[in-house]
UniProtKB/Swiss-Prot annotation:
GO terms for biological process: regulation of DNA-templated transcription. A motif (Nuclear localization signal) lies at residues 646-653. Residues 293-454 form the JmjC domain. Zn(2+) 2 binds at C558, C560, C575, C577. GO terms for cellular component: nucleus. Disulfide bonds: none annotated. Residues 43-54 have a biased composition (Polar residues). Transmembrane segments: none annotated. Pfam families: JmjC, JmjN, zf-C5HC2. It comes from Arabidopsis thaliana. This is Probable inactive lysine-specific demethylase JMJ19. The gene is JMJ19. Its main location: nucleus. Residues 678-694 have a biased composition (Basic and acidic residues).
Length: 708
């Protein structure tokens, strides 16, 4: 076509219809480079005119010609080699907020129980909840009579037990450095967002004796060398280690966190397993220490009657943990795993200063942490990577987040409430022991923790559903015994307050059953149903292969992978097999779960007996005694039994069991109180009938009354 053809085509007015020839459409954009114009003779033809047919002065026609080519990117030039290099994100250090030296945090409440109040651990803590939970933390000073022996001072532990502490390095050289945690990586730890980063490394081995010697020497040298390092102009009056008080050490801690001038390193022994290292409390109850076997002995706190952890056998939450600190060693911001309660006792040593943000301000705290890490590093914090950081509680207070301060001395307890974030630092060598527990009011917090873990695909340390239905088993048992004997026991009092039509525990069970019902109706209605075998989770708890959620109540399995399960929400992500090859596994039917609600509401004694029989026969918990005859014991099967058992068979059991039950109940039941409900249960359970026990007619019961 040539230059003349292009010019003719342009003059004809067909500029908008120009398109690339077939096969010449560019798949990528390219950039036109501006070429400098040299001085040329009038006769010479520019390179631009040779290639496009336009002169340098005909700019409008040239622009129209180029705009008809959609593969050309306009308004760009070829960048220089330096511009092509990837730019590093500019990281600016956050300018420390000017916190007034006179800024005072709100103090946590301190309680002094009497001998009588101190006797029942969980009841006393429950009485403090309304007053102390808004602070997130509180301190309990035991009565003068409570002086348990510190077994950590015994020679076999003090000089023989070895541990490997963390080396915490913070200061100028560690700013803006992200270091992953080498200890328990807890997504709930707020150590991932803060103002001052800290490096954590594994330290050498120490005994308590050698660690104390190192801690005392370090404390003397640190405050003795402070004036020499900072200079006489910037230094404060010289402080001797034996004259230091908590306020002096806290001032030094604030200096390190908010505006460090030197780099320092300290040691901190965190989360030492007392089952291996040794506990400060006596494990047994000899004659001289029998009075220290109460719930305030942290070896028995998790398993106290009324703590749901007594129904769980998980060492990671049931075994107390030991912490060994030194001057300026820090516990970084964190929240307890599964949002459990914590009870901390300071055995020996210097005081510890705690800072806490209550669970009601949890969202504000997390938002402030994210903004701090974004401003410091220029990138969003990742859920899986948690760098170790510290944040000044006084700066949090300036941001509008209420922070509580608590000073714990040796021989005192500190209670951390569910959902609270907390941090701490030590004023010198000390040994602190911590135990978790879960009273009934923890269940709403545990439910939230389960949902958060599933969203983050994180394994839960405990099975929430197992705890929930194990607690239901205990509640029905206590209510049933009271219905028979009319004896007001401590167990009945505890469960009677939370059960009933509008009780806390009853409402939690109803909510969980409603959620399970909706999932079964809308997600797995087309799958074949099978009841779980007792060997399903006899060894290990089952988890969803996608979200790692607990599968105690229901699960989905496929024939292509026998040991692979998923929750109902992630059924389609289990495998690529069609639905006809997948099976829905359940522990209880919906009718049986509705029967549990009736039993907890306490309206009918017959519902309690029927649920107890169902729960004993099909509960896969190893702690539950099997109701099978003796000849069936010892038989094991790896297959999941199909759902071919009807409700009448479940309620009936064997004839021998029915006769034994009838003889035992006949001696206990009162003729006037509750006799009708009990007889209805026994009579209906001895029949092969599909009718519920509470629908039996009065005519069928009349002749049996005459016989009795």
């Amino acid at each position: 076509m040539g230059i003349e053809g292009v010019s003719t085509y342009l003059k004809s007015g067909n500029m908008d219809t120009i398109s690339a020839p077939p096969g010449f459409v560019s798949q990528t954009s390219f950039v036109l480079r501006n070429v400098p114009r040299d001085k040329e003779s009038p006769r010479s033809v520019s390179r631009q005119e040779q290639t496009t047919g336009f002169g340098t002065d005909d700019k409008d026609s040239c622009n129209m010609f180029l705009k008809s080519r959609p593969w050309i990117v306009h308004g760009h030039t070829i960048p220089s080699s330096e511009a092509l290099r990837p730019k590093k994100t500019e990281v600016r250090r956050r300018r420390p907020l000017k916190v007034s030296e006179t800024k005072v945090l709100e103090e946590a409440p301190v309680f002094n129980p009497t001998e009588e109040e101190f006797r029942d651990t969980l009841s006393y803590i429950s009485s403090l909840r309304d007053r102390a939970e808004p602070y997130g933390i509180c301190c309990v000073v035991p009565p003068p009579s409570w002086k348990p022996p510190c077994l950590l001072k015994e020679k076999q532990i003090w000089e023989a037990s070895t541990f490997f502490p963390q080396v915490q390095l913070f200061g100028i050289q560690t700013e803006n450095r992200k270091i992953k945690k080498e200890v328990d990586a807890d997504s709930n730890d707020a150590a991932s967002e803060g103002v001052q980063l800290c490096r954590v490394e594994r330290g050498p081995g120490y005994t308590l004796k050698s660690f104390k010697n190192f801690a005392d020497t370090y404390k003397k040298s640190h405050f003795g060398m402070k004036d020499e390092v900072l200079g006489s102009e910037n230094s404060s009056p010289s402080l001797k280690p034996n004259e230091l008080i908590v306020a002096d050490i806290e001032k030094e801690y604030r200096q390190i966190v908010e505006s460090p001038l030197i780099e320092i390193g300290v040691l901190y022994g965190n989360d030492l397993d007392t089952a291996t290292f040794g506990s400060g409390f006596p494990l047994s109850a000899p004659s001289e220490s029998s009075k220290y076997s109460s719930g305030w002995n942290l070896n028995s706190t998790a398993k106290l009657p009324g703590s749901l952890l007594s129904l769980e056998d998980c060492e990671s939450v049931c075994v107390p943990r030991l912490s060994v600190g030194m001057c300026l060693s820090s516990q970084f911001w964190k929240s307890e795993k599964e949002r459990l309660y914590s009870l901390c006792y300071l055995h020996v040593g210097a005081p510890r200063v705690w800072y806490s943000v209550a669970g009601c301000h949890r969202s504000k705290f997390k938002a402030a942490m994210k903004s701090f890490i974004l401003e410091m590093s220029g990138e969003q914090p990742k859920k899986s990577h948690n760098p170790v950081m510290m944040m000044s509680p006084y700066q949090l207070s300036v941001e509008g987040i209420p922070v509580t301060r608590c000073v714990q001395h040796p021989g005192q307890y500190v209670i951390i409430f569910p959902g609270s974030y907390y941090s701490a630092f030590d004023c010198g060598f000390n040994c602190l022991e911590k135990a978790n527990f879960a009273p009934l009011d923890w269940l709403p917090h545990g439910d939230i923790a389960v949902q958060v873990n599933q969203e983050m695909s994180k394994t839960s340390l405990i099975s929430y559903d197992k705890l929930l239905f194990s607690a239901a088993r205990e509640a029905v048992k206590c209510l049933k015994e009271y219905g028979l004997s009319k004896k007001n026991t401590a167990c009945y009092t505890r469960w009677n307050d939370s059960c009933g039509t509008d009780g806390l525990f009853s409402n939690i069970i109803k909510s969980r059953i409603k959620l399970e019902k909706n999932r079964r109706e809308f997600l797995i209605s087309s799958l074949e149903s099978q009841r779980m075998d007792k060997s399903y989770d006899a060894v290990n708890k089952r988890e969803c292969c996608v979200c790692l959620g607990d599968l105690y109540l229901s699960a989905v399995n496929c024939s292509c992978s026998a040991n692979r399960y998923s929750c109902l929400n992630h059924m389609r992500k289990l495998c690529a097999c069609p639905c006809d090859r997948k099976s829905f596994l359940y522990r209880y039917t919906m009718d049986e779960l509705n029967l549990l609600v009736e039993a907890l509401e306490g309206k009918k004694l017959s519902s309690m007996f029927r649920w107890a029989g169902i729960d004993q026969k099909f509960c896969a918990s190893p702690a539950t005694t099997s109701s099978k005859p003796e000849e069936d014991k010892g038989k094991e099967t790896d297959e999941v039994t199909p759902c071919n058992i009807t409700r009448k068979d479940v309620a009936a059991g064997t004839k021998d069991q029915t006769r034994v039950k009838a003889r035992s109940l006949a001696d206990i039941l009162n003729v006037k109180d509750g006799n009708n409900d009990a007889k209805e249960t026994l009579e209906s359970c001895s029949k092969k009938s599909n009718r519920p026990c509470d629908n039996d007619s009065s005519e069928a019961n009349a002749p049996k009354k005459q016989k009795q």
